[in-house]
Amino acid sequence: MAKKPIVVDFHSHILEPYVQKMAAGRTVTSGFGAQAEMPRPPGSRREQWFRQMMEPEAQIEGMSKMGVDMSVISSSTVIQWTGWASPQTQLDLDRRINDMIADWVRRFPDRFVGCFSLPLKDLHLALPEMERAVKQLGIRVANLPASVEGVYLGEPRFRPFWEAANELGVIAFIHPDGVQDPWFQKYSLWNSVGQPIEEAKVMSSLIYEGILESFPGVKIVMAHGGGYMPHYHGRLDRNVTNRPDTMANIKHPPGWYLKSFYYDTCLYDPTTLDALIAKVGADRILLGSDFPVGETDPVGFLRKAKSVDDRAFAQISGETACAILGIPHER
């Protein structure tokens, strides 16, 4: 029987029941405790989402309906954010998440690739957990927020993390865990506007602080297509013309580094995907649905973009993801 290419979804979420219960009322979905959590009555769409994030069989069923062969699964940090906890408690919660993800991968190795979570408030705890995830659990993708306690990931505080990630061959998947500014709670703007802003901020941090210069071998995947950053970088490049001192840590204009990132397709608008492809190339883009709460037909979405020809479709739907994950593209 002839082999065929597989479709890989790089952006799919899970929930660990105990961690989710502990996080209830403490995350961005409740305004960090300012309002009640949304109910999920039996039979509701929200109840189905939670089941798909807690039960691997339910997630696999959803994947198959979408035409997805493998999913890279990460904690839904907007629902079960662990940053509310003390560093030691956060470590305990993140370990529960990582162990659950490793169990899903062990039980269904042909369907899941794992992402591990880290208590980044304390690198003395986070770095050993990263080593455990890689060497004991066999997970090579880190599920990272945009910032920790208001400090973005490019800052010197996190350089030891990037050094260790580089040594361990870790892939970084950056997904903001929600904006704490209460202004964004109205109309759920934390999700529609706040997340793309956070992605632009963390990308700026990584570029300007020289992380991409120092660790070019670390592959960084941006959720939600990198937010606003890829579409407004001209202002950054223009700024360094007037202020060359802002290039203290970089050798090129900021926009040059856009092709150093990978981006998922969780954009919801085919013309935005076309614009992203024009900026960075189809070989830097990975299919990502934000399952189960996001794009319901991620494969069909690719076909709606005018710039996605057969070659680009192959790259985005799975070829590039398999290459950076080190797994076969055909089965």
Predicted segments with their positions:
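Portal/gating segments that form or line small-molecule/metal binding sites
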Residues: 91-95, 102
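Mid-to-C-terminal alpha-helical segments outside catalytic/metal-binding sites
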Residues: 2-10, 17-70, 99-107, 128-132, ...
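Divalent metal-dependent hydrolysis catalytic cores, especially in the metallo-beta-lactamase
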Residues: 40-52, 58-85, 112-118, 140-144
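A short acidic, glycine-rich active-site loop
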Residues: 45-50, 91-92, 193-200
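Catalytic pocket-lining loop regions of alpha/beta-barrel enzymes
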Residues: 4, 105, 132-286
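Short glycine-enriched loops at secondary-structure junctions
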Residues: 76, 120, 176-180, 291-293
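Surface-exposed, active-site-proximal loop segments in enzymatic domains
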Residues: 77-90, 124, 187-192
